[in-house]
């Protein structure tokens, strides 16, 4: 794909983001944190990086100084990830961590550009069983994750790179709105 078409695809995906849903997600996360709960985020590959970026903006700060906010990325503890993958299966690397760390009222975000990452789906299922509010960040058709999470923010693109760019855009939008509440 040439550069102009790539930019056009990114612009189209950005214009098709559901702003009302994004505002609702920011409100849900803010409310959970204000109530003493936390945000838990996970994904694979570039989505793992997005999960860590999201958490860094909340535990550090985004655009203004504020207190650190309770957020955990389940993609950072390589010992836990590799032990779970080795002893059980890579399919449960997030669900086992969710079972250990989540409590009712937490918000759990699973990021998967295809919506079909088995370990992300299993992590969301575990979070729902615990009583967490679950959110999927997806692309393409939303995949299987769309039918599992309480709500889905789907990027209207089939290009993984564009989906990832829009996920980080959405994460920044959410962090900016959360900043205003704390």
From Swiss-Prot:
<comment type="pathway">
    <text>Carbohydrate biosynthesis; D-glycero-D-manno-heptose 7-phosphate biosynthesis; D-glycero-alpha-D-manno-heptose 7-phosphate and D-glycero-beta-D-manno-heptose 7-phosphate from sedoheptulose 7-phosphate: step 1/1.</text>
</comment>
<dbReference type="GO" id="GO:0097367">
    <property type="term" value="F:carbohydrate derivative binding"/>
</dbReference>
<dbReference type="Pfam" id="PF13580">
    <property type="entry name" value="SIS_2"/>
</dbReference>
<dbReference type="InterPro" id="IPR001347">
    <property type="entry name" value="SIS_dom"/>
</dbReference>
<protein>
    <recommendedName>
        <fullName>Probable phosphoheptose isomerase</fullName>
        <ecNumber>5.3.1.28</ecNumber>
    </recommendedName>
</protein>
<feature type="binding site">
    <location>
        <begin position="112"/>
        <end position="114"/>
    </location>
    <ligand>
        <name>substrate</name>
    </ligand>
</feature>
<feature type="domain" description="SIS">
    <location>
        <begin position="29"/>
        <end position="182"/>
    </location>
</feature>
<feature type="binding site">
    <location>
        <position position="57"/>
    </location>
    <ligand>
        <name>Zn(2+)</name>
    </ligand>
</feature>
<comment type="similarity">
    <text>Belongs to the SIS family. GmhA subfamily.</text>
</comment>
<dbReference type="InterPro" id="IPR004515">
    <property type="entry name" value="Phosphoheptose_Isoase"/>
</dbReference>
<feature type="binding site">
    <location>
        <position position="53"/>
    </location>
    <ligand>
        <name>Zn(2+)</name>
    </ligand>
</feature>
<keyword id="KW-0119">Carbohydrate metabolism</keyword>
<dbReference type="InterPro" id="IPR035461">
    <property type="entry name" value="GmhA/DiaA"/>
</dbReference>
<feature type="binding site">
    <location>
        <position position="117"/>
    </location>
    <ligand>
        <name>substrate</name>
    </ligand>
</feature>
<feature type="binding site">
    <location>
        <begin position="86"/>
        <end position="87"/>
    </location>
    <ligand>
        <name>substrate</name>
    </ligand>
</feature>
<comment type="function">
    <text>Catalyzes the isomerization of sedoheptulose 7-phosphate in D-glycero-D-manno-heptose 7-phosphate.</text>
</comment>
<keyword id="KW-0862">Zinc</keyword>
<dbReference type="GO" id="GO:0008270">
    <property type="term" value="F:zinc ion binding"/>
</dbReference>
<dbReference type="GO" id="GO:2001061">
    <property type="term" value="P:D-glycero-D-manno-heptose 7-phosphate biosynthetic process"/>
</dbReference>
<dbReference type="InterPro" id="IPR050099">
    <property type="entry name" value="SIS_GmhA/DiaA_subfam"/>
</dbReference>
<feature type="binding site">
    <location>
        <position position="172"/>
    </location>
    <ligand>
        <name>Zn(2+)</name>
    </ligand>
</feature>
<dbReference type="GO" id="GO:0008968">
    <property type="term" value="F:D-sedoheptulose 7-phosphate isomerase activity"/>
</dbReference>
<feature type="binding site">
    <location>
        <position position="164"/>
    </location>
    <ligand>
        <name>Zn(2+)</name>
    </ligand>
</feature>
<dbReference type="GO" id="GO:0005975">
    <property type="term" value="P:carbohydrate metabolic process"/>
</dbReference>
<dbReference type="InterPro" id="IPR046348">
    <property type="entry name" value="SIS_dom_sf"/>
</dbReference>
<dbReference type="GO" id="GO:0005737">
    <property type="term" value="C:cytoplasm"/>
</dbReference>
<feature type="binding site">
    <location>
        <position position="164"/>
    </location>
    <ligand>
        <name>substrate</name>
    </ligand>
</feature>
<keyword id="KW-0963">Cytoplasm</keyword>
<keyword id="KW-0479">Metal-binding</keyword>
<keyword id="KW-0413">Isomerase</keyword>
<feature type="binding site">
    <location>
        <position position="57"/>
    </location>
    <ligand>
        <name>substrate</name>
    </ligand>
</feature>
<feature type="binding site">
    <location>
        <begin position="44"/>
        <end position="46"/>
    </location>
    <ligand>
        <name>substrate</name>
    </ligand>
</feature>
